[in-house]
Amino acid sequence: MNQSLLASFGSSEERVIAALDTFKQGNGVLVLDDENRENEGDLIFPAETITTEQMAKLIRYGSGIVCLCITDELCQKLELPPMVAANTSVNKTAFTVTIEAAEGVSTGVSAADRVTTVKVAVADNAKPSDLHHPGHVFPLRAAENGVLARPGHTEAAVDLARLCGYKPAGVICEITNDDGTMARTPELVAFAQKFGYAVVTIEDLIAYRTKYNK
């Protein structure tokens, strides 16, 4: 990661602290992975507090593939099997079958409908029958032990939520440029500065968790 591009957001640890502070308030955090991996930035919100306005931001400025990052425990509770039997994706992204709230939504596509689906999935009393398949929200199963086990945005979302005292679930979407191409670090920094988002890298989160044994 080109650290010079992130200098305005502070040191590695300062970036994590700022990200945790803003996430605790229910605000979004922009998480960047390694330039040799996906080289993308995901805007992430806590699943249990996400608003329709925040979801609309993800849809407006993201790829449109809004994902709900959750633990294996919740996947099992909701009986969400893997999307495919043999995962051949480069980064082994653990998609499950897609979901839609069984009640309270229309077509499931709008920002409000997707928020409803997310809230239903992470509710304390959630059960398999609360969800229909397929749907317009894409659950992702996080690796146990988070970014220390897999340096992905899925794990970063769950780690951020857990570290902030939320249920271990986050809503993410990759940020894109206006022309539809993927936003890279320079564009992501400009995006964060324009909208006032905290920026943190997965490398930052790994270092923080390792240092403080969290």
Curated annotation (Swiss-Prot):
Its cofactor is Mg(2+); Mn(2+). The lineage of its organism: Bacteria, Pseudomonadati, Pseudomonadota, Gammaproteobacteria, Pasteurellales. GO terms for cellular component: cytosol. The record marks 136, 174 as: Essential for catalytic activity. It comes from Mannheimia succiniciproducens (strain KCTC 0769BP / MBEL55E). It holds the Pfam family DHBP_synthase. This is 3,4-dihydroxy-2-butanone 4-phosphate synthase. The gene is ribB. It catalyses: D-ribulose 5-phosphate = (2S)-2-hydroxy-3-oxobutyl phosphate + formate + H(+). Binds 2 divalent metal cations per subunit. Magnesium or manganese. Its EC number is 4.1.99.12. Mg(2+) 1 binds at residue 38. GO terms for biological process: riboflavin biosynthetic process. Mg(2+) 2 binds at residues 38, 153. Catalyzes the conversion of D-ribulose 5-phosphate to formate and 3,4-dihydroxy-2-butanone 4-phosphate.
